[in-house]
């Protein structure tokens, strides 16, 4: 349990022990928790820092430990989510609060950080800029792409609601005249509302990855909803800019053209991503320096969630932080 994120209850089957009793014994006598609680534990629920784990490439992300309470966690990419991964874990997501805690790490160590990846949160950006003066800030490509995908799906959903309203109107008209309502059926067997519902997954994929039935459905969808086709092409182009551009110099003009085309399209759902790109232009382009993403932070976040699930929730946050840092810091 010192080295692996497991619950004491998971040992019952293999060692024929009482899991709850062993958990208490581990917490009170075997783990060193009580000594830790009297020292580092005094401020554990506010922050824990591990300056020795700092490295040139860091990630910063937020995670929920218990009851939706958010913590900010800084991790070292080179630890690959294992021992030595956690550099700092801090309660809350306010930029100034995070920076004040990170300043407890000696400046000469913070100056060694060359690059830090993050999502598109302005809070994370401010905290990183205040704390790591020599670091290049990189906006995670997958968060940018997700904004475009969300905008595309928002457009599809709006058309689906329109289709549902239209079908309900026609049903009411048919009922008023004593006739049965026969919905429009396309050549693949989908009704209009089914077409818009069943197209959800194909819009997430590149056209070359569509199955035969998805290709047929996409053609029908795009023939009847050219706005969805335009939005899909914009989303796909953004994906290709990230996938094919090898340098910042190549990506910059492509991204500028893409931004102009988004503005010309005029879709309300794409306004958010246009504004986000404008606000984070430098951080977005910094991806093309080393093609660094925040995937390591997302992966580490998933490990925390899995550990929390094994424990069936976190009733004692301080003890959970003790175990988490014992394993990963």
Regions found by a protein language model. Give the residues of each.
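Short, amphipathic alpha-helical "recognition" segments used to contact nucleic acids or chromatin
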Residues: 1-6, 243
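Short, basic interhelical loop/turn and adjoining N-cap
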Residues: 6-27
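A structural signal for short, well-ordered beta-strand segments and their strand-loop junctions
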Residues: 12, 59, 117, 137-139
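The DNA-recognition helices of helix-turn-helix-type DNA-binding domains
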Residues: 15-18, 29-33, 40, 120, ...
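RNase H-like nuclease fold core
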Residues: 23-115, 122-127, 134
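Acidic/histidine-rich catalytic cores and adjacent linkers
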Residues: 67-68, 77-83, 108-134, 142, ...
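Short alpha-helix plus adjacent loop in nuclease-associated cores
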Residues: 141-165
